[in-house]
Regions:
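Acidic, small-polar-rich N-terminal luminal/periplasmic segments of exported/outer-membrane proteins
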Residues: 39-175, 531
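Gram-negative outer-membrane beta-barrel transporters
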Residues: 31, 379, 427, 434, ...
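Outer-membrane beta-barrel translocator/receptor signature
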Residues: 117-119, 131, 140-149, 154-221, ...
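C-terminal beta-signal and adjacent terminal beta-strands/loops
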Residues: 648-656, 677-732
């Protein structure tokens, strides 16, 4: 098994430090939680909604990382994948711009088909996003980002086996104001972001936000247009309506458009299958079509087809809240629609070997109603949830090897799922608190799959009632039990058992060379045994949080690619590890953050392409991961200068569940830096930045097609990017 060494002296000091440290609704005008101070000499509290009510982060008995507006800005976190650099245990895989899937503590879903839901759930202003293809590339005008590690099977429930990520946008308030940012960078980057807040009356306020992202392709294609460019526009319009002293409604309209981006961000590498069928890199050898890339630079490629990516995402959310002396009623209604066109050169070579296209449509409606209340030592929350979504996809493939003509895999997925949940919390004493919760989910799904190949000897039309397994229902019970102990002020110890589940489904094979009985797979279930601590010390100048966990993972939905056959199989797994997060203000205006993650995953039996089984590690689960950030501000030129550096180091990791030699990503580090000046009135700011300062080459995804084409194709993280941003802010 893959192992990585870690400096023992650092581990010892962190453990010692952890042992020593163990010795209501916002007002109408409030738009953001109190930012973590980087200009004062003490840490401010961070407000989160990890339990669907506002709490101090240090009072929540769970492993949570949160970024407020100030932190997002000073770290220069702009894209939805940038946050992985400062969240212990968080990775991501991204098949170009088309699909983004987070990996938290090794829990993920590597299937690139759009109909799959991810086990790390994404919430946008309390609304669950079921489609992995709907996650846009840009974060803008956010109040907060929260990352909750571990199963969230009670209050959030749906498919949050590994955890969840919440994006909370800035809301309209009663004061006029706004901002505008303009960025110019290398690769022709031209980006802008802005927001304008305006009260319309004593009871109505509006906020409009937008972001545009454009850059030329990172990959130089000697045969045509550069690859991996971006041309995206996103916007959000919100109305906040105060209907009475005790109630308000928030209406949000939002949309994203990606226009004619060049997709297929693959880099080619020669490979051959070994005796087990897993790929081994064979540098210098041509692939099966006779091609060999002479360049060792992954950003120099030769592809005969220009890929394409068009996407439109739009939706609406209505959030209502009614407060009484006894309880608060909250309603969240959400509608989301996605349309996508995607095409790629799958073989990554200048020869016409295999092209793959996707035409994808998705729509969902969800509704949540919940009540929460309590008095004295007792607090409670109960609610119901319903989601209905439909997705359809056509995946035509073209290849000279198609003896019976080009083919098209067509499939449609429908899901109707109600759920009910409840959680109670009781203070046993001033120091002890007990918490218990449960959720029941009914998942009613149907799948219609057609492999359309008119000249083929036989075709497969997988649909009920001809195939009864094409219509399935699942009864999922999840929940948690937790005990919290406060031995002293500003210190919390907790222990919990959490159970999460993700519904079963179907593989959506694009080749059609598959038996009907291999399409369905069962739900996965994860039980998390966890202990942790949270502490604030050194006169509110230091914060240290830590956790240890053990995952018992039943029927993990593992993704396998055998030739052109894409299949999901249930396998058991275990996963254990922990995290530490340290935040310091050692000097006035100096902020230091440090994070550590350790993982040990084990899958006893995976399927091998050549037959048989072998043990493996979970994909994208490095044994060690470190992140750090330092930010300092000082007065100069009548204003404030700021400087910051941050980065992340990952030990070696496998990118696919097959654990082949070709998908082993060696350890690597990525570093970023930022230098800025802010005017005395806080209206103007100018900043220069560089990301991936050392221009480190590292892969975030790998696809083993060695047995089919004689190569593997990978997706690399962005190269070095740099530029400057000018910002103007007005009002509050």
């Amino acid at each position: 098994m893959l192992r990585a060494k870690f400096p023992g002296w650092l581990t010892t000091r962190l453990v010692a430090l952890s042992l020593l440290s163990a010795g209501s609704t916002g007002s109408w005008a409030d738009n953001a939680s109190t930012p973590e101070s980087s200009t004062g000499d003490k840490l401010e509290e961070i407000i989160v909604t990890a339990q669907k009510r506002e709490q101090n982060l240090q009072d929540v008995g769970a492993s949570v990382t949160a970024f407020d507006t100030a932190t997002l800005q000073r770290l220069g976190l702009h894209g939805v994948t940038d946050i992985v650099e400062q969240v212990p245990g968080l990775q991501f895989n991204q098949y170009g711009a088309t699909v983004t899937v987070y990996n938290l503590r090794g829990v993920s879903q590597n299937d690139f088909n759009d109909h799959q839901e991810a086990p790390v759930a994404v919430y946008d202003d309390e609304a669950y996003v079921a489609s992995t293809g709907a996650l846009a590339g840009t974060m803008y005008d956010l109040q907060r980002v929260e990352v909750l590690r571990g199963p969230q099977g009670t209050l959030f429930g749906r498919n949050a086996t590994g955890g969840l990520i919440q994006y909370i946008s800035n809301k309209p308030d009663s004061e006029s104001g706004g901002y505008f940012d303009f960025t110019r960078g290398n690769y022709g980057a031209i980006n802008s972001e802005g927001a304008m807040n305006q009260p319309l009356s004593d009871s109505v306020a509006a906020r409009f936000s937008f972001a545009t992202d454009y850059h030329e392709g990172y990959i130089e294609n000697t045969l045509g247009h550069p690859i991996e460019d971006q041309n995206q526009v996103a916007a959000r319009l919100q109305f906040r309506i105060k209907t009475s002293d005790n109630s308000e409604i928030l209406v949000k309209l939002h949309g994203v458009n990606n226009d004619h981006e060049t997709a297929g961000d693959y880099t080619w590498a020669s490979a051959r299958p070994d005796a087990t069928g897993r790929a081994v890199l064979t540098p210098g050898q041509p692939d099966f079509s006779g091609y060999n890339n002479p360049s060792n630079n992954p950003f120099d490629q030769e592809q005969d087809r220009r890929g394409i990516f068009n996407r439109t995402v739009w939706g609406a959310t209505v959030h209502g809240e009614w407060r009484t002396d006894a309880f608060t009623l909250t309603s969240v209604s959400d509608y989301l629609r996605v349309q996508k066109r995607y095409g790629e050169d799958s073989d990554g070579s200048p020869n016409f070997v295999f092209d793959f296209d996707v035409f994808y449509h998705f729509q969902q409606f969800s509704q949540e109603l919940r009540l929460n209340g309590g008095s004295g030592p007792f607090r409670w929350l109960a609610g119901v949830y319903y989601i209905n979504y439909r997705s359809s996809q056509n995946s035509p493939t073209t290849s000279p090897a198609n003896l019976f003509g080009d083919a098209d895999a067509q499939f449609a997925l429908r899901d109707s799922s109600p759920a009910g949940f409840a959680q109670i919390e009781y203070d046993l004493s001033d120091r002890w608190t007990a918490l218990v919760g449960a959720r029941y989910t009914y998942d009613d799904k149907s799948f219609d799959y057609l492999y359309d190949c008119p000249l083929c000897p036989q075709t497969l039309h997988y649909v009920a009632p001809d195939y009864p397994a094409a219509s399935r229902a699942f009864n999922l019970v999840t929940g948690k039990a937790e005990i919290d102990y406060k031995p002293m002020k500003d210190t919390l110890l907790y222990a919990s058992v959490n159970r999460g589940a993700k519904g079963g489904g179907w593989s959506a094979d694009t080749s059609g060379i598959v038996s009907p009985e291999t399409l369905p797979y069962n739900p996965e279930k994860l039980t998390d045994y966890e202990v942790g601590f949270k502490s604030t010390f050194w006169d509110q100048r230091a914060r240290l949080n830590g956790s240890l966990f053990y995952y018992d993972y039943k029927d993990y939905q593992g993704f396998f690619l055998f030739g052109t056959n894409t299949v999901v199989r249930n396998v058991n797994a275990t996963d254990k590890g922990g995290e530490l997060e340290l935040t310091l203000v050692p000097l006035q205006r100096l902020n230091v953050q440090f994070g550590l993650s350790h993982l040990e995953s084990f899958v006893p039996a995976i399927l091998l392409p050549a037959g048989g089984t072998a043990s493996a590690q979970l994909p994208q689960a490095p044994h060690w991961s470190l992140n750090a950030a330092v930010h300092y501000e000082w007065p100069m030129f009548g204003g404030t200068m700021s400087a910051g550096v941050d980065g992340k180091w990952n030990s070696a990791q496998y990118l696919e569940l097959e654990n082949s030699q070709s998908d082993l990503q060696a350890s690597y580090a990525v570093a970023n830096a930022r230098l800025g000046f802010r005017s005395a009135d806080d209206h103007w700011e100018v900043a220069a930045f560089v990301r991936n300062a050392t221009n480190k080459y590292y892969r975030i995804y790998n696809l083993d097609v060695a047995g089919l084409f004689g190569d593997v194709v990978g997706v690399y993280g962005p190269p070095r990017t740099y530029g400057a941003t000018v910002s103007y802010r007005w009002g509050r």
